[in-house]
């Protein structure tokens, strides 16, 4: 199990990303808009830099829904490789069967 504080911090980051998503997208569009003057684009860059650091989606870590493990995650299932294997062997994941050839 991951530390509860790490899982909670990641959840807080997800909330911040959702809260600032529209504002961040609008600022990035202004930065890329070549019709604006340099000063306006620079002001948009400064505004983007002044947003909370944790509102950047790159800072959100994919974690296992069961254990909070940050590494070895399968995106499709939202589980770590270990939790996925345990659930699959118990038959708790529909459509997943152990391979044999």
From Swiss-Prot:
GO terms for molecular function: rRNA binding; structural constituent of ribosome. GO terms for biological process: translation. Residues 47-66 are annotated as: Disordered. The keyword rRNA-binding applies. PROSITE patterns: RIBOSOMAL_S14 (PS00527). Pfam families: Ribosomal_S14 (PF00253). Keywords: Ribonucleoprotein, Ribosomal protein, RNA-binding, rRNA-binding. NCBIfam families: PRK08881.1. Part of the 30S ribosomal subunit. Contacts proteins S3 and S10. Belongs to the universal ribosomal protein uS14 family. This is Small ribosomal subunit protein uS14A. It comes from Myxococcus xanthus (strain DK1622). The gene is rpsN.
